[in-house]
A protein has these predicted regions:
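Transmembrane helix segments
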Residues: 80-119
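Residue-level recognition of transmembrane alpha-helices
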Residues: 31-32, 62-63, 90-91, 138
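Short amphipathic alpha-helical coupling elements at transmembrane boundaries
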Residues: 15-19, 81, 123-126
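Hydrophobic alpha-helical transmembrane segments of multi-pass membrane transport/permease proteins
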Residues: 1, 89-101, 137-148
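Junction motif at the cytosolic side of a transmembrane helix
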Residues: 140-164
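Alpha-helical transmembrane segments and their short interhelical loops
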Residues: 24-25, 32-81
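Transmembrane helix boundary and interhelical loop/hinge segments in multi-pass membrane proteins
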Residues: 1-20
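Structural signal for membrane-spanning alpha-helices in multi-pass inner-membrane proteins
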Residues: 42, 46-50, 73, 98-105, ...
Length: 164
């Protein structure tokens, strides 16, 4: 996501979008849905080749994971001015996002650890059907969406070196 947004910044695409009738929500949804669909299609092919039982649940888990990481990538890309800066900014996010699920998979963790959003994604990708966890994950996605919306709005207001 960082490379996509930073390429748009370098080509001044965001300058055009800031003055166009495109809404911030449409911009965010276009990025998130396009990458989510691509990752879901790939996940579905992988699940089919591995003969997984719950292909649909696994694909939904992949789609939700893609949405969360795309939204986090948009937040970081809105603050980064170069690819190196984006990579440095993404390191703490990656640690926060990946360490608990790795520990959850490798160790026998308590049930409260299953409320962590990325642990929920891992359990969905594994094929577990838990609709309460899906609702929790959707709620977290909505919260992250509004945070992303705030960051993208503030970055669009600063486009072109002038605060609008």
């Amino acid at each position: 996501m960082g490379a996509i947004v930073l390429l748009e910044k370098s080509q001044r695409v965001l300058n055009s979008l800031a003055v166009s009738p495109v809404k911030v929500s449409e911009y965010i949804l276009s990025k998130v849905i396009s990458l989510g669909v691509i990752s879901s299609i790939v996940a579905m092919f992988i699940a089919i080749t591995l003969n997984l039982d719950n292909i649909i649940i696994s694909t939904i888990g992949t789609f939700f994971s893609s949405i969360i990481f795309s939204l986090l990538g948009l937040i970081l890309a809105s603050k980064a001015s170069s690819l190196n800066q984006f990579i440095v900014l993404s390191i703490p996010i990656e640690i926060i996002c990946f360490i608990p699920p790795i520990l959850n998979v490798l160790l026998d963790t308590k049930s409260y650890a299953n409320l962590y959003p990325f642990n929920i994604c891992i359990s969905l990708i594994s094929g577990d059907k838990n609709f309460i966890m899906i609702n929790i994950l959707i709620s977290i996605i909505i919260i992250i969406y509004f945070i992303t919306y705030y960051f993208i709005c503030s970055s669009w207001k600063k486009v072109g070196g002038v605060k609008l």
